[in-house]
Amino acid sequence: MTESGSVTGSRSVPVLARGPRAWTAWAAGVWSLAFGAAGVHWAAGGAGFPFGAADPRAVQVGSLFAEAEPGSTGPAIAALGLLGVAVALVMARSAGARLPLVFAWAMSVGLVVAVPDVRVIQNFGYLFAGYTGLWDGPLLFMLFCIGGGALWAAAAWTYQGGGAREPVRWGTPVTYAAALLALPYGISRISWAMGIPLGVQPEMLAGGNATGGSVVEAVLGGLCVAGAILTLGLVQRWGEVFPRWMPLLRGRRVPIGLAVVPALCASAMLVQSGARLYLWVAKGDIVLKADGWGSFGPGLAWLPWGLALAAATYAYYLRRRAE
């Protein structure tokens, strides 16, 4: 089939076109179909609605959908899912139109940043401590939405033909900035694990450590420190070639995706959670005091940390792709 121009300036291709642009669009469309079907189910009174009164922790964690009701939110989800299917079909068949690209990026940001809340990063950290007691339906729906956001980001990325082609000069400084921004939260939690009441009253720390909180704090702090070290790998030789002390892998090239995918996942969690903290500060829900700043103060580094990590990952991707 030959390509032909359209009113929008896009290029028509076969419906079953192959290649990254086509299959990422189809994947986003299939996800949107499932998303819309869930909306229809909830609008019809089906069980499992993940927002509002069905989510007992929604208000506590500052969910943007704490007041949502299935009768109004269900149809909205159904309509958005249907629109997503239609846009995905357009993206799979043509390239160059602006509106589908804007929709795809808006869907990605909304699904990754707006729908999830701090429970995602909270349960990610607790998972390393072996605790899964807070897993529930709303959390699973958040993860489902994050997956959908990733699919829409991939569809948008391939639809626009990728990003810049040349390595950027700011990659190294922004990578070091991301590594440094990982430390405030890590230092505070490691201090708590060691019994040092950094930024909190000793009574609060003693109560938490008596119930095993020191183990959790050590894990959370250790994750931050490990994240800082791994971030440095984005500009170090061992981030491109496996070091000698790694059996079977030594000397082999590090797959780009092995560094990029986990870093982007971490960045998404940090941005979505960090944005919530700033929203709470703006609303006056969080007030930093001299004897209690350690509870939330270090978390204010999450948003800039996540943004810097995303930028550092992008710079790494461009540098490795140019090899």
Please provide the spans of the model-predicted regions.
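An N-terminus-focused feature that recognizes amino-terminal "leader" regions
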Residues: 2-3, 14-147, 159, 294, ...
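Cytoplasmic membrane-interface segments at the C-terminal ends of transmembrane helices
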Residues: 15-23, 86-99, 152-174, 229-254, ...
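Juxtamembrane loop-transmembrane helix junctions in multi-pass integral membrane proteins
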Residues: 16-26, 65-68, 95-98, 132-139, ...
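Alpha-helical transmembrane segments of multi-pass integral membrane proteins
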Residues: 29-41, 106-116, 144-151, 172-194, ...
